Amino acid sequence: MFTMKKSLLLLFFLGTISLSLCEEERGADEEEGDGEKLMKRGLFSILKGVGKIAIKGLGKNLGKMGLDLVSCKISKEC
């Protein structure tokens, strides 16, 4: 009976150690993954900002062209 308790205690102890090592590795992997996520988020926000600027510039140019076309049609100078 005593040897069975010792072996169960040993198994519990070894299982606890292996579990804690796995959790440490998982934590290290998650820390590395956070850096990649932040980099992806940063890249996405940069692309999003560039897209907004491009759309605003395109909208202004189209607006100017539209106004020029309308004024040309009204004054019949086209």
Curated annotation (Swiss-Prot):
Expressed by the skin glands. The keyword Mitochondrion does not apply. It is found in: Secreted. Disulfide bonds join C72-C78. GO terms for biological process: defense response to Gram-negative bacterium; defense response to Gram-positive bacterium. Its main location: secreted. Keywords: Amphibian defense peptide, Antibiotic, Antimicrobial, Cleavage on pair of basic residues, Disulfide bond, Secreted, Signal. The keyword Cytoplasm does not apply. Residues 23-39 form a propeptide. Residues 1-22 form the signal peptide. Pfam families: Antimicrobial_2 (PF08023), FSAP_sig_propep (PF03032). GO terms for cellular component: extracellular region. Belongs to the frog skin active peptide (FSAP) family. Esculentin subfamily. Antimicrobial peptide. This is Esculentin-2Vb.
